[in-house]
């Protein structure tokens, strides 16, 4: 078994906005949430015997036990966290899953492992918030229809600050922390000039982002505005080599439009899945080669890019905590061993970064 480990990324003062909220409002903010991606419930390895439904569900439930087992666990007491004295991990406001929920359309098994009513723990029920991935079928698939039902249930329970007209994109507002779930990627339509390499699906296909960028722009304009409140964005495709290879899961033009839309907002983090790897990195990479920059943006590279903290999610657990104006991100690998405080990042965000002006 892989030794449990924490990868800690600490961003001190990352959430200090241009317009500073009242001190009492910041003092009251204490938000914890968990993020995983790519559980691929129902996956069958063609080189191994077929797994039964019981095996699939059993493995998934053990994964949930490892994730929820971090609740009540002390944060690392050494390194840069020592001065913050964060205490123990609280019950999260939500468990977010950044796509590729299933393989083989096993929505039945997925909802047994991650019930629509929430994951039950000894400390309470945890709502589950979903994004779709490229393995989750076309818009009329059982998984997509199931995700829509879960989103509408969150809406009826008044957990959401906003939801798109089609019910597939949404946002929550946790004490002034805005978390947006944007599906496959924050774009509006399939890029017809550079379509997905295999199958070349068009509008209405499984790779259609379904107006996610327009939903994001509208939400940020109407619910965040010039407040400087922190924003977290989640979608399936990222900025890693797999997400930006010549299959064109999403395209340089789409990424540049996304980048431009974030100007003026206090983006605390971007979360994604797809590459099955837990990591923290900056986008755009300030040390990127000209070739890498072209891969990200084509011929439309921003001249003096603002960078964003990006967290790639595997199938175990990023733990995020926002207290006042501090943002802590740590990766938990399961029960049993200790803490790994590498890599450690300590940085502040300047007003220029927050404005995003070039």
Predicted regions and their residues:
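Bacterial N-terminal signal peptides that target proteins for export
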Residues: 1-7
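Bacterial N-terminal signal peptides
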Residues: 7-17
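N-terminal active-site segment of His-dependent metallophosphoesterases
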Residues: 22-108
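Metal-dependent phosphoester/phosphodiester hydrolase catalytic core
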Residues: 24-58, 73, 127-129, 161-253, ...
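Short helix-terminating capping/connector loops at secondary-structure junctions
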Residues: 27-28, 81-92, 122-125, 225-229, ...
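Active-site neighborhood of phospho(di)ester-bond hydrolases with catalytic His/Asp-centered motifs
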Residues: 35-37, 93-100, 128-134, 233-236, ...
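Extended active-site neighborhood of metal-dependent phosphoesterases/phosphodiesterases
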Residues: 105-218, 257-263, 269, 280-333, ...
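Short, solvent-exposed mixed-charge patches
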Residues: 355-358
């Amino acid at each position: 078994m892989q030794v449990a480990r924490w990868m800690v990324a600490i961003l001190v003062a990352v959430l200090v906005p241009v317009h500073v909220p009242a001190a009492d409002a910041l003092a009251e903010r204490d938000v914890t949430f968990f993020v995983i991606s790519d559980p691929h419930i129902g996956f069958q390895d063609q080189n191994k015997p077929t797994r039964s439904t019981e095996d699939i569900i059993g493995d998934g439930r053990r994964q949930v036990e490892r994730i929820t087992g971090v609740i009540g666990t002390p944060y690392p007491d050494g390194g840069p966290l020592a001065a913050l004295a964060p205490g123990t991990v609280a019950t999260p406001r939500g468990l977010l899953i950044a796509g590729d929920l299933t393989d083989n359309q096993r929505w039945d098994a997925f909802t047994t492992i991650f019930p629509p009513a929430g994951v039950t723990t000894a400390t309470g029920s945890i709502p589950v918030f979903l994004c779709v991935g490229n393995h989750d079928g076309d818009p009329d698939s059982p998984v997509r229809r199931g995700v829509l039902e879960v989103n509408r249930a969150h809406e009826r329970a008044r957990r959401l600050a906003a939801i798109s007209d089609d019910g597939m994109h949404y946002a929550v507002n946790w004490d002034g922390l805005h978390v947006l779930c944007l599906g496959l990627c924050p774009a509006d339509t399939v890029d017809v000039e550079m379509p997905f390499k295999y199958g070349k699906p068009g509008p209405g296909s499984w790779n259609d982002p379904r107006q996610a960028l327009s939903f994001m722009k509208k939400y940020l304009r109407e619910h965040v505005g010039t407040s400087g409140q922190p924003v977290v964005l989640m979608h399936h495709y990222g900025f890693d080599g797999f997400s930006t290879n010549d299959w064109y899961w999403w395209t340089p033009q789409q990424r540049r439009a996304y980048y431009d839309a974030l100007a003026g907002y206090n983006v605390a983090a971007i979360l994604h899945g797809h590459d099955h790897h837990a990591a923290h990195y900056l986008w755009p990479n300030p040390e990127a080669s000209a070739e890498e920059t072209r891969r990200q943006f084509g011929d439309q590279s921003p001249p003096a890019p603002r960078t964003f903290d990006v967290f790639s999610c595997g199938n175990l657990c990023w733990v995020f905590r926002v207290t006042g104006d501090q943002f802590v991100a740590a990766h938990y690998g399961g029960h049993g061993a200790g803490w790994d405080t590498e890599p450690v990042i300590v940085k502040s965000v300047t007003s220029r970064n927050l404005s995003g002006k070039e």
